[in-house]
């Protein structure tokens, strides 16, 4: 079986909504290649192990790569996706580009691994692919062994890095953590490495739960993290000290009240996946519900907010 790689170059303002359209139409993962990441490469303060390659990024804007099963990707679906994208108010119609290529099953399964190498994601955390060998550079370094699978991120996105930095700052061993939209499980593993004993990882996608469980096994914490399917926090009855959600902004907006109600007094809501054009609305909503915003990080057009539950 082959796969169709649909490549779209668009402006930054349309990235979140375009990604949502692709995922809603059945894309098996979306790769985001942001030209800002090449122009504004992070300082080498965390000892990044490899440099970004110019040929992997568009000259300007953002390249989205979506992957569709050849059995379901037909002319009707192709046109439907294109029509919905071109109808986005945020889209710059003059600079959008579409292209496609066919990827054989064997290439699809392995080619992406060529771009995933060990890297320092934050001051403490280093992400290590499960198929590579890596030696710690310092005793305090915390290594997360990761095999994200084809449909989940490798941890190098700015939103993940900012969440890891927030975990370093606000999560303590005595805390309890719930990770909403866990994906590969990277943020739950980071919390475990900090020393947290009670961790629950949720994802609406059962494939994500399966991938997360395998990564928990690789990091020797499969019996210490509860990984279950879950629709955000709608059915959650337990209380936690930390709620983490690195998901899309419109989904975060839906769960702010539930996050507040799930937290113990003084607990923290760590959330990212928010493009800069959306963060003020998310921040205002959090404040209306009762959160005190105590941290705001920005990185290449993405934002991470930390709100604390503090009653009047």
Swiss-Prot record:
<feature type="binding site">
    <location>
        <position position="160"/>
    </location>
    <ligand>
        <name>S-adenosyl-L-methionine</name>
    </ligand>
</feature>
<keyword id="KW-0963">Cytoplasm</keyword>
<dbReference type="GO" id="GO:0032259">
    <property type="term" value="P:methylation"/>
</dbReference>
<dbReference type="InterPro" id="IPR050078">
    <property type="entry name" value="Ribosomal_L11_MeTrfase_PrmA"/>
</dbReference>
<feature type="binding site">
    <location>
        <position position="203"/>
    </location>
    <ligand>
        <name>S-adenosyl-L-methionine</name>
    </ligand>
</feature>
<dbReference type="InterPro" id="IPR029063">
    <property type="entry name" value="SAM-dependent_MTases_sf"/>
</dbReference>
<dbReference type="GO" id="GO:0016279">
    <property type="term" value="F:protein-lysine N-methyltransferase activity"/>
</dbReference>
<dbReference type="InterPro" id="IPR004498">
    <property type="entry name" value="Ribosomal_PrmA_MeTrfase"/>
</dbReference>
<comment type="similarity">
    <text>Belongs to the methyltransferase superfamily. PrmA family.</text>
</comment>
<protein>
    <recommendedName>
        <fullName>Ribosomal protein L11 methyltransferase</fullName>
        <ecNumber>2.1.1.-</ecNumber>
    </recommendedName>
</protein>
<comment type="function">
    <text>Methylates ribosomal protein L11.</text>
</comment>
<feature type="binding site">
    <location>
        <position position="246"/>
    </location>
    <ligand>
        <name>S-adenosyl-L-methionine</name>
    </ligand>
</feature>
<dbReference type="Pfam" id="PF06325">
    <property type="entry name" value="PrmA"/>
</dbReference>
<dbReference type="GO" id="GO:0005737">
    <property type="term" value="C:cytoplasm"/>
</dbReference>
<keyword id="KW-0489">Methyltransferase</keyword>
<feature type="binding site">
    <location>
        <position position="181"/>
    </location>
    <ligand>
        <name>S-adenosyl-L-methionine</name>
    </ligand>
</feature>
<keyword id="KW-0949">S-adenosyl-L-methionine</keyword>
<keyword id="KW-0808">Transferase</keyword>
